[in-house]
């Protein structure tokens, strides 16, 4: 059994504090932009057991994981990154954390500025991806049917 003093409760990778009590694959999903599949690929390429507890890894293993996170976009096919075609550069990119949030916000603002269909739907707070809006997605005061009193 491992002593509690050896367990690091927080492991810092790519400006994100990860839960040290979780397995490596699950802990890596705490970084915005990394899902379960990407975490599995990163852990395997770093040579770390995916089921090992994150807080019990040595510094060299954490450094290897961080290197693989940085090298992830170059080591996977174009369709596996979260921005296969960047709007401005045209190159495939994989963004993490606040960079991903800012890029998504910039994309929405660009659509609003272009006044394309999706941009107009975003402006009006309506559903964007073709869902039906007659019965679901309503907002405002709820008015139900009331029973008549005798």
UniProtKB/Swiss-Prot annotation:
PROSITE patterns: RIBOSOMAL_S13_1, RIBOSOMAL_S13_2. The keyword Signal does not apply. The keyword Secreted does not apply. Keywords: Ribonucleoprotein, Ribosomal protein, RNA-binding, rRNA-binding. It comes from the Archaea. GO terms for cellular component: cytosol; small ribosomal subunit. One of its GO terms (molecular function) is rRNA binding. GO terms for biological process: translation. Part of the 30S ribosomal subunit. Forms a loose heterodimer with protein S19. Forms two bridges to the 50S subunit in the 70S ribosome. Belongs to the universal ribosomal protein uS13 family. Located at the top of the head of the 30S subunit, it contacts several helices of the 16S rRNA. In the 70S ribosome it contacts the 23S rRNA (bridge B1a) and protein L5 of the 50S subunit (bridge B1b), connecting the 2 subunits; these bridges are implicated in subunit movement. HAMAP family: Ribosomal_uS13. This is Small ribosomal subunit protein uS13. It comes from Methanocorpusculum labreanum (strain ATCC 43576 / DSM 4855 / Z).
